A protein has these predicted regions:
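Short, small/polar residue-rich loop motifs at catalytic or cofactor-binding pockets
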Residues: 34-36, 155-157
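Hydrophobic "anchor" residues on beta-strands that sit immediately upstream
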Residues: 160
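Glyoxalase I/VOC metalloenzyme domain signal
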Residues: 1-29, 42-93, 98-151, 163-176
């Protein structure tokens, strides 16, 4: 899971990259081809993110944080669309994306994982039922959509750790 940051111009993209490098980021190679226009970086803790080229139509109206991108086949996108009640805004070429009806960044999935999973996810989503909601009912609803409970060694905690159909961990919190 990583962030896609957008750019208004080539200079803006270069400035975002320079700022990230000044803050301890570094260039990384994830198999991108030399002719790709986006820049792949990692933050000081090794979390990947991309600085997308200007003029990217897919992320054009999403804001600076264009997307939260993750590996995963189409069923993962279908699951999250149903789980969050957000419309599927892209379903093409083994890639899916959802977006809040209110706008903002997209959440995207595309293809199989590029690297084998090693331990728990470094980044994950938290789902919080409404204040008057019920955690158990939300867990049951998500299981009905294709999620499953998992144990990652969390012990006795107030949240429930689950995995989506692609094996990505997420937590269901107590009502907030």
């Amino acid at each position: 899971m990583h962030f896609d940051l957008t750019s208004r111009s080539l200079e803006d993209q270069q400035q975002t990259v320079a700022t990230a490098l000044d803050l301890g980021g570094r260039h990384i190679d994830v198999g991108q081809s030399p002719d790709e226009e986006h820049v792949v970086l990692a933050d000081p803790e090794g979390n990947e993110f991309c600085v997308i080229e200007p003029g990217n139509a897919f992320l054009a109206d999403c804001g600076f944080l264009g997307a939260l991108a993750s590996d995963g086949p189409p069923p993962v996108g279908y699951f999250w669309s149903a789980a969050l009640g957000w419309p599927l805004v892209w379903d093409q070429d083994q890639e899916t994306a959802i977006r809040s009806p209110r706008g903002g960044p997209k959440i995207t999935w595309g293809g199989p994982p590029q690297e084998a999973k090693d331990g728990k996810n470094r980044l994950h989503l938290d789902v919080a039922p409404a204040v008057d909601g019920d955690q158990r009912a939300e867990v049951d609803r998500l299981i009905g959509l294709g999620a499953r409970r998992i144990d990652i060694g969390q012990g006795d905690v107030s949240w429930v750790v689950m995995a989506d159909p692609g094996g990505n961990e997420f937590c269901v919190l107590t009502p907030q």
